[in-house]
A protein has these predicted regions:
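Conserved beta-strand scaffold positions in the cores of enzyme catalytic domains, especially
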Residues: 7, 19-21, 62, 111, ...
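Histidine-centered active-site/metal-ligand motif
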Residues: 1, 39, 43-47, 115, ...
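Short, charged, surface-exposed secondary-structure boundary motifs
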Residues: 17-20, 72-73, 234-241
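Metallo-beta-lactamase
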Residues: 44-162
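Short beta-strand micro-motifs in enzyme catalytic cores
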Residues: 36, 46-48, 206
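Cytosolic catalytic domains that perform sulfur/thiol-centered chemistry
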Residues: 91, 104-106, 120-252
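Generic beta-sheet signal
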Residues: 8-11, 114, 251
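Active-site HxH/HxHxD metal-binding segment of metal-dependent hydrolases
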Residues: 1-39, 53, 58-60, 243
């Protein structure tokens, strides 16, 4: 709303707010460059990869979302309910997407994935944030399976149960969320000790202390939870505080 930019989703998406639902191979022009939509279902049914075509018409990079990571691919077990498919069927669909849309692209294309090491969206992601597609073709286990059956078996093997908040994430992605400005307006106010006591006792607020462990150890509010900002803050909070509507008082 601030910039006037329109939101673009991949084919089959059904958001509850205004957005462009792109078609497979649809091209969007941004100045002198183009973005081509490659529908790559498997992680979810609307999952898409966005191919960057530069001013000279050269295919330069892909923004691969949750389809292709560095060292891994998107887990195919999260959209079973919405897609009315088994995880094996979704994994097979992901294999077909990779083989038909990603593997034929040139080796010098740069891969920009949506997640990196530490994310629960994959099991074998590298810490690097960018790589060539050619190197991924050589080193990514998921791109080196001899057939669909082997791919499905290897991709599903060893997947940990998804964090419990993932289901709510899906609903928020579809339904929309309050603007960041609105969140900051209501959530960035200093609280007095009386305010905190009122929120904890009457609103059921949880106290989340974001300081490092050493500072927390020196003194803390009883019954508070310490998850330091350094490290995997977001995944730990998501794992330990399952209800995304849980009122939280931050100690920083």
């Amino acid at each position: 709303k601030k910039t006037g930019a329109e939101i673009v989703f991949g084919p089959t998406a059904n958001p509850e707010f205004e957005a462009i639902i792109a078609k497979d191979n649809q091209i969007f022009e941004i100045g002198k460059i183009k973005i081509k939509v490659l529908h790559t279902p498997g992680h979810t049914m609307e999952s898409s990869t966005f191919l960057l075509i530069d001013e000279e018409g050269k295919e330069t990079a892909i923004f691969s979302g949750d389809t292709l990571f560095l060292g891994d691919v998107g887990r195919p077990d999260l959209a079973q309910k919405s897609a009315h498919m088994t995880q094996e069927e979704l994994a097979g669909l992901l294999y077909e997407s990779l083989q038909s849309k990603i593997m034929p692209l040139a080796d010098d294309i740069i891969v920009y994935p949506a997640h990196g090491a530490g994310s629960a969206c994959g099991k074998n992601m590298q810490k690097e944030t960018v790589d060539s597609l050619g190197n991924q073709k050589k080193t990514n286990y998921a791109l080196n399976q001899p057939n669909k059956e082997s791919f499905v078996r290897e991709v599903l093997d060893g997947l940990l149960p998804p964090p419990k908040y993932f289901g709510m994430n899906v609903a928020m992605n579809k339904g929309g969320i309050p603007s960041f400005d609105e969140v900051m307006k209501h959530g960035n106010k200093p609280l007095s000790a009386d305010n905190v006591e009122e929120l904890v006792e009457h609103a059921g607020a949880l106290i989340l202390d974001t300081r490092n462990a050493e500072d927390f150890h020196k003194g803390f509010i009883p019954n508070s939870i310490n998850i330091g900002l350094k490290g995997d803050f977001a995944p730990w909070v998501g794992a330990m505080i399952v209800d995304v509507k849980q009122p939280i008082v931050l100690v920083a």
